[in-house]
A protein has these predicted regions:
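Secondary-structure end/capping motifs
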Residues: 226-307
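Ligand-binding clefts/hinges and TM-proximal coupling segments of bilobed small-molecule sensing domains
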Residues: 142-158, 238-270, 312-314, 323-329
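Conserved C-terminal helix/tail region of periplasmic/extracytoplasmic solute-binding proteins
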Residues: 297-336
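Short, glycine-/small- and polar/acidic-enriched structural segments
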Residues: 27-177, 181-187, 201-206, 211-212
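Pocket-lining segment of extracytoplasmic ligand-binding domains
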Residues: 92, 170-261
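Bacterial N-terminal signal peptides
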Residues: 10-18
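N-terminal export leaders
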Residues: 3-7
Length: 336
């Protein structure tokens, strides 16, 4: 009995220590609300779910609630209002919000390269065939609108030469029904659409058309970062760790993507292969100065930011938070 008591007592002390320090107790984790721009997520957006499912968030001391929305603009608005602690949105839209003094900054860009395609119906064979066609967008200034106008500009087609048609976030049904002639689809959406209608085809891969404009950027409110810097350092570090996990653990990543993106495993696997081949996901902070400045300048060029309101790199990026977050994580060469 005496020997058993000696064994149990240290165990109880250790258990109490774990509760005191937070190890092994979810009560000690820092709560954080994170917004994702699509419902359900696409494969490219799966990073926070990977961080949650693999325990990376917990390792960093975070208890993250992931909420989904019907577009990146809604995420940005909820971060600005304070309803969300952080979330992911289009890098260009974030630049516009920063120019309007919204009080936000970028933490990391888990997917700095576009993961989208301009998928078109069979009546469009070449870029000039876009003239007079119905271009599917969610709302003016939204992700699909920005990318569609980007493609038109590259092809020398004026906005007034096409018809912009507002649709819901789910682009595939109206494309299949002929309500629109084009849709901005992520690679997994494109594969699903082509299985239903083989005549649909990809006119543009945006990671090739515009490799320097930032795509999926995680933002947070400046006031919240100033009040709780450690919380946001943990988030940034966890997301970078999740990206690195994904590059070296295909099977688990595909499993998580299939579960949360509600995809057949083979489509999730095909999307994974396309995204990793194109290096769409970053392995560092993803916020290279040249790409941040390119994104800002692009928004000035298209008239979404007035020249006298143009933000600087330092206005866009939460530099001190990122620097502290990534201490001890060696930079991966040849990746953003």
């Amino acid at each position: 009995m005496h020997r058993r008591s000696l064994v149990v007592l240290p165990a109880l002390l250790l258990a109490g220590l774990a509760l005191w320090t937070g190890r092994g107790s979810t009560q000690q984790l820092i709560k954080l609300k994170f917004g994702n721009p699509t419902t359900p997520p696409n494969t490219v957006h799966i990073i926070p779910w990977v961080a949650k499912e693999t325990g990376i968030f917990a390792e960093e001391g975070l208890d993250v609630e992931i909420l989904t929305f019907e577009g990146g603009l809604y995420v940005i608005r909820n971060v600005v209002s304070g309803a969300l602690d952080a979330g992911g949105g289009p890098g260009a839209s974030i630049a516009v919000s920063i120019a309007r003094k919204a009080g936000i900054k970028a933490l990391v860009s888990p997917a700095p390269r576009f993961a989208s395609t301009l998928t078109v119906r069979s009546n469009i064979k070449k870029p000039e065939d876009l003239k007079g066609k119905k271009i599917g967008i969610q709302e003016v200034g939204g992700f699909a609108d920005i990318l569609s106008r980007m493609a038109l500009r590259k092809f020398g087609i004026k906005p007034e030469e096409v018809n912009f048609v507002p649709i819901a976030s789910a682009d595939v049904p109206p494309l299949l029904a002929g309500a629109i002639d084009t849709a901005i689809l992520h690679v997994d959406q494109m594969e699903i659409a082509r299985r239903k209608e083989p005549s649909l085809h990809t006119l543009v891969k945006f990671w090739e058309l515009e490799p320097n404009q930032l795509f999926y950027v995680v933002l947070a409110q400046e006031k919240k970062m100033a009040a709780e810097p450690v919380k946001f350092q943990k988030l940034a570090r966890a997301l970078v760790k999740a990206n690195r996990f994904m590059y070296t653990n295909k099977a688990k990543t595909v499993e998580i993507a299939a579960k949360y993106a509600q995809l057949p495993p083979d489509i999730a696997a095909a999307a994974y292969d396309e995204l990793t081949r194109a290096k769409v996901w970053s392995q560092n902070d993803g916020l290279r100065r040249d790409k941040v400045e390119y994104t800002i300048n692009r928004m000035v060029q298209v008239g979404n930011i007035k020249p006298d309101a143009k933000p600087k790199y330092e206005d866009y990026v939460a530099g001190p938070i990122i620097e502290e977050a990534l201490k001890g994580l060696p930079r991966i060469p040849d990746f953003d």
